[in-house]
Amino acid sequence: MSVVIRLARAGTKKRPVYHVVVADSRFPRDGRFIERLGYFNPLMPKDNEARLKLDMEKVKGWLAKGAQPSDRVARFLDTAGVKKREARNNPEKAVPRKERKAQAEAAAKG
């Protein structure tokens, strides 16, 4: 059983609120979960402390048991200083493709 810490959407249409839950990865996003760890309200200002509420003791316990955080929850945990998130790196993104290189060289020659 692969256990993840992720966001489950709640709230109404156009006014989302997310519960931070521990769930089996096979369960639906908003479906069954094992335990609720907190909530996230994206409509609140970023500097408001009520925007994100997490029970850090429970989070640390689930991480110790092997639960994997989702990308968004990993950002929250990195900000809180609980778990360091490795930076994403794509060095080939800025390298032009072969065709573009050939076109640029041809244009430079003449």
Curated annotation (Swiss-Prot):
It comes from the Bacteria. One of its GO terms (molecular function) is structural constituent of ribosome. Residues 82-103 have a biased composition (Basic and acidic residues). Keywords: Ribonucleoprotein, Ribosomal protein. InterPro entries: Ribosomal_bS16, Ribosomal_bS16_dom_sf. One of its GO terms (biological process) is translation. The keyword Ribonucleoprotein applies. It holds the Pfam family Ribosomal_S16. Residues 82-110 are annotated as: Disordered. GO terms for cellular component: cytoplasm; small ribosomal subunit. The keyword DNA repair does not apply. PANTHER family: 30S RIBOSOMAL PROTEIN S16, SMALL RIBOSOMAL SUBUNIT PROTEIN BS16M. This is Small ribosomal subunit protein bS16.
